[in-house]
Amino acid sequence: MENRIHRTEIQIYVSPFLIVIFLLMSISSNAQQIIAKQMPFLEQLPSNEVIDLHQDQNGFIWLGTKNGLGRYDGYQLQTFKSDFNQPHLLTDDFIWCFAEDDNCLLVGTRQGVNLVDKSNYQIRPFPDTEIQNTWINFMLVDSRKELWICTRNQVSHYNSDYSLKKRYGNLIPAVPNNGINSIYEDHFGNIWVCTWGGGLYKYLKNTDTFMSFPTLGANNNPFKIFQDKDDQYWILTWGDGIYRFHPDATEDRMYTHQEIFNEKLHQPETAFFSVVQDDVYGYIWIFGYHELYAFKVADGHLEKVDLSSYMFDYNKMFSQIIKDREGNLWAGAYDSGYHLLMGNPAIANNFLPKLKRHVGFDTNITTLGIDPNNGLWFNQERWGLCWYDIEQDKFYDYSNTNSGVHN
């Protein structure tokens, strides 16, 4: 086997939190390996009310709260908020949404957009003064590196240098309670907009306009649209449940309603607002108003996964769920949140006993790293650096001594 240590970028995490999680993932021989832990930095947050989360291109986890911005680097949390020393650091400390381009993290608040320079973490206001002092509902940097910013009832489209291309004013009627819920780019580069009370829209690039779709449910209130790994579309609504969406079908076959029943409340769940699909089991994880749900897709329909055996409270007041680049999930909530680690089923459950046989004494893993080539780097105390090939279920030694690798 060629020496992977010279050709692989390695992400190493020395946090004891992750080491404990790895050991827990090797306990059960039958259960699916999903481990839920409280977010490890809650006491450092400016507020436990986590509104939105984002993992940037460098791997940092950003958290938007009602009282400031946090950046987690795997060890500790750095906070950004206006105070008496820096009264205008952010245009507003109530963080609502994120987007990211090659140079900046874009932070949406109740008072416009802030640009966080990723090279030095200097913060400045977004140059378009028309949207400052405005609640930013949602933002998207698309595959063409163009920016879309949604405010109450309009969408603003920008070039990559933040110059305005076009403002789509009054996309929906400016009546009380109407607004833009979200904007989304699918796998084919199509841009979709979900609106409160105004229905679903698709951007038509050839005419530079938005096309509306037929009324959805009784309230015509799509909250999020999502395309799964098999390119199937799902629409989460606020008030009418979840629909399978067939964009090219006739109007009478365009929306297929999914029956989602809340056993605890003995009634259908009708309001949904955040969605992601994990890479390990292919479950679609969705936040409902009352509960966190996980679904399998079978014959084009959602089948509920029983989460009752997992040790976490899935009835929290959740806010946003995201997937990090290691395939694990982060679930923000208005009263803290969870880090859901998706155990790779390719890793044998007797990993630790095998390692003990390999080294000849008790295992004591002090450092873990995730290898993008489907493996794990780790340091075994009194042995040294090792690499575990998940596909081949083999260990490889990379230390010339048995003294170990010290942090």
State each model region's role.
Residues 1-407:
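Carboxylate-rich, polar loop motifs that coordinate divalent cations or form catalytic acidic clusters
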